[in-house]
Amino acid sequence: DILMTQSQKFLSTSVGDRVSVTCKASQNVGTNVAWYQKKPGQSPKPLMYSASYRYSGVPDRFTGSGSGTDFTLTISNVQSEDLAEYFCQQFNRYPLTFGSGTKLELKRADAAPTVSIFPPS
């Protein structure tokens, strides 16, 4: 089986940033790679096919590149709705195999603050 490795388990970003999600195939898969976006409680949404082609309706801030064994999904001008998990998949050879996923999350400084109220001592 072809192993798809996503070495970045998490990527921290801010709204407006540009981020790159990487994926490496254990053998040459040409450009037979797709990318998916997965949000909690939702089905995976196809983003890219054949490494660099966007599905209809996918914003053009998503771009894909690569061939052979090394692939990248780049998100320019990250929006809050882009905070999700991203998976690569090879369809060069059966069985079709997926990467383990990269979760895009807000940098801690950008996350909403939490307030704790303690009773008087």
UniProtKB/Swiss-Prot annotation:
One GO process term, biological-process aspect: adaptive immune response
Chain ranges of the Ig-like V-type domain: 1-104
Disulfide bonding pattern of the chain: 23-88
Residue span of region Complementarity-determining-3: 89-97
Region Complementarity-determining-2: start-end pairs: 50-56
Chain segments carrying region Complementarity-determining-1: 24-34
InterPro entries per the UniProt record, alphabetical: Ig-like_dom, Ig-like_dom_sf, Ig-like_fold, Ig_sub, Ig_V-set, IgV_Light_Chain
Cellular compartment(s): Secreted
Record function comment: Anti-influenza H3N2 neuraminidase antibody.
Name of the protein described by the UniProt record: Ig kappa chain V region Mem5
